[in-house]
Amino acid sequence: MTPDPGLLEACWRDFVLGVVQGLTEFLPISSTAHLKVVPVLAGWGDPGLSVTAVIQLGSIVAVIAYFRADLAGVLKGISGAFRRGQWREPEARLGIAMLIGTLPILIAGLCIKLYWPGYATSSLRSVPAIAVVSIVMALLLGFAELLGPRLKQLNQVDGRDGLVVGLAQVFSLIPGVSRSGSTLTASLFDGWKRADAARFSFLLGIPAITIAGLVELKDAFSGSSAGGVLPVFVGICSAAVVSWLAIDWLIKYLESHSTRIFVVYRLLFGVLLLVWWSGSASN
């Protein structure tokens, strides 16, 4: 039996979205911006928040698998803290920081869900808005790179770090900001070593991305989604594989390089988007 061409096209689109998601979720360049812009440039239209949020589950599978030893250490540290009161152990402090850092975006996301029903179609998701935000975030990341020294490591993390970086993570609800970009920028401003800042950003993102994906799971798998379950599953799988590769590359890259390449990319991305939008708007 010949497969339905509509289903094949839906699988191809979600595969591409998964690759884009995997490449951009953990790099400080905004997955939301690229998941909005790439389909528009391809003539597919905006896939919507529900589909893109669920495809993010592939990234979560990757980050949990990649940091499984760290997460096991956190669980062991928290367990030991409850049993023996060892709250100053690095693993316990990391767990507390992750919990504290998740609360701000959880509260903000809930407020948006309850009180801003038009968020998914608001002007914040427009191409010019995303372009401007990308340029602003590039400048902030570039400025953070100028500060020093880079001394703080992951084993020094505490509740204050969780709160500071967690508050920065809230800004990632603005399309184009980038969750990893906002948390990495905040960490660099606070004197973190780059690779350790990236590791904490990835770990902190696990609860936030998981919750966002699960909240939208029902809508993305509903009959209204093009092709039903299979295309979304394809997108999740491609996002998982590419996310793993992106995480591994970024951590190794930041061991010996600055974030300058991402500053330049985000500036060019924002400027080119504005040029493209201006040209299309005038036609």
From Swiss-Prot:
UniProtKB keywords: Antibiotic resistance, Cell inner membrane, Cell membrane, Cell shape, Cell wall biogenesis/degradation, Hydrolase, Membrane, Peptidoglycan synthesis, Transmembrane, Transmembrane helix
Keyword Glycoprotein part of the UniProt annotation: no
Catalytic activity reported: di-trans,octa-cis-undecaprenyl diphosphate + H2O = di-trans,octa-cis-undecaprenyl phosphate + phosphate + H(+)
Domain of life where this protein originates: Bacteria
One Pfam family per UniProt: BacA
GO aspect biological process, one term: response to antibiotic
One GO location term (cellular component): plasma membrane
Enzyme Commission number: 3.6.1.27
Further details from the record: Bacitracin is thought to be involved in the inhibition of peptidoglycan synthesis by sequestering undecaprenyl diphosphate, thereby reducing the pool of lipid carrier available.
Protein function: Catalyzes the dephosphorylation of undecaprenyl diphosphate (UPP). Confers resistance to bacitracin.
Family per record: Belongs to the UppP family.
Protein name (Swiss-Prot/TrEMBL): Undecaprenyl-diphosphatase
Record organism: Synechococcus sp. (strain CC9311)
